A protein has these predicted regions:
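A short, Lys/Arg-rich alpha-helix, primarily the initiator
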Residues: 1-23
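Residues in the recognition helix of alpha-helical DNA-binding motifs
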Residues: 14, 28, 39, 69
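Short alpha-helical DNA-recognition segment
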Residues: 19-38
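The DNA-recognition helices of helix-turn-helix-type DNA-binding domains
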Residues: 32, 43, 70-74
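Short, basic-rich loop-to-helix N-cap that marks the start of a DNA-contacting helix
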Residues: 43-57
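Intrinsically disordered, low-complexity basic tails/linkers immediately adjacent to helix-turn-helix/homeobox/MYB/SANT
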Residues: 57-65
Length: 80
């Protein structure tokens, strides 16, 4: 799993925990539905920090809480 896949999986899990749809997340986080769809479908190769912060605000969690999860614990360093 790469970083973008881990971000998408984390968003899916947070939505699932709250019984939210991506559309509801879009509403509460003030992030366009197309942006969320792009992240979840793997089309966005580098979701921006500001976007992730807005999503965290919608979930009412910190960036630290977002990235402190099993999805990110198993990531290997990406070298390009």
């Amino acid at each position: 799993m790469n970083t973008c896949e881990a971000i998408a999986e984390r968003i899916r899990n947070l939505c699932r925990e709250r019984n939210w749809t991506p559309n509801h997340l879009s509403y509460v986080a003030a992030v366009p539905q197309a942006t969320i769809k792009s992240i979840l479908n793997g089309e966005s190769k580098n979701p921006g920090t500001v976007t992730i912060k807005k999503l965290c605000d919608g979930f009412e969690i910190t960036l630290g809480e977002f990235f402190s999860s099993a999805e990110f614990d198993a990531l290997e360093q990406e070298i390009r």
